[in-house]
Amino acid sequence: QKKDKKDR
């Protein structure tokens, strides 16, 4: 699963 930059 890739984490989006919005997951910050």
From Swiss-Prot:
It is found in: Secreted. Expressed by the venom gland. Keywords: Pyrrolidone carboxylic acid, Secreted. The modification Pyrrolidone carboxylic acid is found at Q1. One of its GO terms (cellular component) is extracellular region. Belongs to the tachykinin family. This is Tachykinin-like peptide-III. The lineage of its organism: Eukaryota, Metazoa, Ecdysozoa, Arthropoda, Chelicerata.
